[in-house]
Amino acid sequence: KGYNITASHSDSPSFKVKENPEITTDKHYISLNVEKYGGMIMSTWLDRPLSVAGRAVAISRSGIKEYLVNADKDLLVIPNLAIHMNRSVNDNTSLNPQKDMLPLFGDINAKDNFDEYIKSCIQSEDKDKESVADESLTTELFLYNREKGRIWGCNDEYISAPRLDDIQCAYSSLMAYIKALDSISDNYDKVNVCCVFNNEEVGSTTMQGADSTFLSDVLERISIAYGLDREKYMMAIASSYMVSADNAHAVHPNHTDKADLTNRPYMNEGIVIKFNGNQKYTTDSVSYAIFKDICDKRNVPYQTYANRSDIAGGSTLGNISLSLIHISEPTRRS
């Protein structure tokens, strides 16, 4: 009779490796040509151990084969310029993504070029794979920060880690989905759905993004498997509820003026429910009431968030997805 859905996203801001990526500088250094993926603070990528991961496709006479690739080592660094050569570095220095953000891969004495190195990664992950050394390769590879997450603070009350936006919510949603399997009663008439989209950071307009028919197609196929016709599927959609699970901004200790005057969430004070008059988030009075009631009944603390009226803020995937699958305000009948 309906779906209970959590929607999160798997991607984070990064740098995508371009085709033909190798750049030789001064006949000595080999850097990689990359482009920005998503919105980021570029300076946070400097002087950190980085690597690449993603998908590679090998083309051979026997066909096309896909591989997941992770160069599991400290492979790259985007080097900063020393203060002695850039005295204004602390005075709002801007970074050019085509000039300043090229990761250093090695020098001209490197054993493998980048393409050969990726092929060796494919081979090392599974010794039983057919050799791809002589095959043509196409790739979708992204840089990632190799540093591990850390719990810190006087009372270990904070966590810092790469890609919390939005792996944190994707993981929590998946764990909740699995845990709920043990508590579903016989008269439960909903289908629980954990949906993790891709490409939220670049607008969601891809076949695996929120601005696609991916979710609605899957939900309709589930309804067909239950023997429902189109009308009953639409009725099920109208009786569904979706939580868009993404991160929120806490009040910044050094920039408290950047937060809204009355909606000011703090770290470790509970789940954040986000509002936006320009419809960048999914919350309205009905969905808020439902979620608030759930939290109150389970003694789950929650807070509210809104942007300052003179700061645009970000957006997320929920409003995009809801506009396509037409989940209405379902539990008026609850």
Feature names for model-found ranges:
Residues 1, 69-160:
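Soluble metallo-hydrolase cores and metallopeptidase-like ectodomains found primarily
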Residues 5, 187-199, 234-237, 241-243, ...:
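Beta-strand segments within the central parallel beta-sheet cores of soluble alpha/beta enzyme folds
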Residues 10-13, 21, 38-40, 60, ...:
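Acidic, glycine-rich active-site loops and adjacent beta-strand->loop/helix elements
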Residues 325-329:
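Conserved small/polar residues in nucleotide/adenosyl-binding loops
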Residues 86-115, 203-298:
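Metal-dependent peptidase/peptidase-like ectodomains
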Residues 2-88:
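A generic, well-ordered mixed alpha/beta core segment in the N-terminal half of proteins
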Residues 8-10, 30-32, 37, 160-203, ...:
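Alpha-helical metal-binding/catalytic segments enriched in His/Glu/Asp
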Residues 285-292, 309-324:
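Short glycine-rich, acidic/polar surface loops and turns
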